[in-house]
Design a protein with these regions (language model features):
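Activation-segment/catalytic-loop signature of the eukaryotic protein kinase fold
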Residues: 83
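Conserved short submotifs of the Hanks-type protein kinase catalytic core
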Residues: 87-101, 105
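AlphaC helix of the eukaryotic protein kinase fold
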Residues: 49-71
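Protein kinase glycine-rich loop
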Residues: 19-26, 31
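Protein kinase catalytic-loop region centered on the HRD/HxD motif
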Residues: 126-133
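Conserved N-lobe loop of protein kinases adjacent to the ATP-binding glycine-rich P-loop
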Residues: 35-42
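Activation segment signature within eukaryotic-like protein kinase domains
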Residues: 120-121
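Flexible N-lobe loop architecture of eukaryotic-like protein kinase catalytic domains
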Residues: 24, 64, 72-76, 89, ...
Length: 133
């Protein structure tokens, strides 16, 4: 689907979030750059794909993701602000981070300095330890 064909772009989700641009896409969901209208706050808005939202197991996994992340208290994990359903659309509004995605960085510079790799891996492991600890 091209960005111009995306029906979510420009839409208002749950009367609270304006969808501005597609950030990324995965098997179950799409993540958009959005604005929380009441506060003028930028957010990342994760929308469960409509065809997936009809599958009870997928909805359960989406809800479990919310429960797991809201329990995390790590400086290496993003914060979830809101979760809900608007019409047939399940959504998560979360902290929006600025910066370059790791994938883009690796495409631009496939060989990273060892100290940067250590820094990234350490932060990732600390967050995983918190999540599974």
């Amino acid at each position: 689907m091209s960005p111009s064909d995306d029906p979510n772009l420009g839409s208002i989700v749950a009367g609270r979030y304006r969808v501005d641009a597609l950030l990324g896409s995965a098997g179950m969901s799409r993540v958009y750059l959005a604005e929380q209208l009441s506060m003028g706050r930028p957010v990342a808005l994760k929308l469960l794909r409509p065809e997936i939202a009809r599958e009870p197991d997928a909805v359960l996994r989406f809800r479990r993701e919310v429960e797991a992340v809201t329990r995390l208290r790590s400086p290496h994990a993003i914060s979830f602000y809101d979760f809900g359903q608007s019409d047939d659309t399940l959504f998560i509004a979360m902290e929006r981070l600025d910066g370059e995605p790791l994938r883009a960085r690796l495409e631009r510079d496939p060989v990273l300095q060892p100290d940067l790799v250590l820094h990234i891996v350490t932060q990732t492991c600390e967050c995983l330890a918190e999540a599974h600890g």
